[in-house]
Amino acid sequence: MFDFLVMDMAQEGERFDWSWVTGRRDRLLDNSDTVHNAPASWRAWLREGISGKERIRRSVVKLQTAPTRDQQPLARSKEDLALRDIYGFYEGRKARFEALAADVVESRLRRDTTTYRKGWITPPGSDGGADFIGRIDIGRGFGQVKLVLLGQAKCEKIDTATGGNHIARTVARLKRGWVGAYVTTSYFSERVQREVLQDAYPLLLINGRDLGAEVTLMAQEAGFRSVTELLKKIDATYEERLAHRQPEEILTS
């Protein structure tokens, strides 16, 4: 029986330097003459041996994660200005950001042709890990499937990764057949992304860049002259959308 170890080549940008192999075929050269062209994972293997195999193992999940730069809008872009408007608007009253987060999830899902039913916002201090509730419908009539969507909203510093403990708290609330949504003005660390992917959590992640882009589109489609006008309209509905209800109640509403 053989175990195969596929080594990571992230440091090389997934590009293999064949000059290493060519050098190994040259009888006049030994390993010390050619190893500098080898992938970093191979050099680590020579140094550490089998004890370092998990660190150098290729991970498909790692390839699916997004680096921080891809989760933050470009400086002075429309998305960047929108994101900063959002953060400034809710500064000092971040609980009210939940109304915007709920609407962003609704807009995002419907834009992807998902049938979504808006639910309610949970009052501050009583959410237990859920800031807003919605429902995803699949199919029609007798055979229709209804899924509870449990949402978490975090209006936090744009340049600091969102806390993994908040993600864990959201996931812990998900029951069988539920899906989650996590909306942040910030970004997700690689560790958090890998955990979500490896454990196959049914969790929609919306980072700061996606948030800024979606809100910009929402404002344009609604005919508002600025993002702030949209934020004011949504904020005016906050109190009327609060409700003390169990998430399961969305299935019969």
Spans of model-derived segments:
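Structured alpha/beta reader/binder surfaces that contact nucleic acids or chromatin modification marks
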Residues: 1-16
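Mixed-charge (Asp/Glu-Lys/Arg
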Residues: 10-12, 19-253
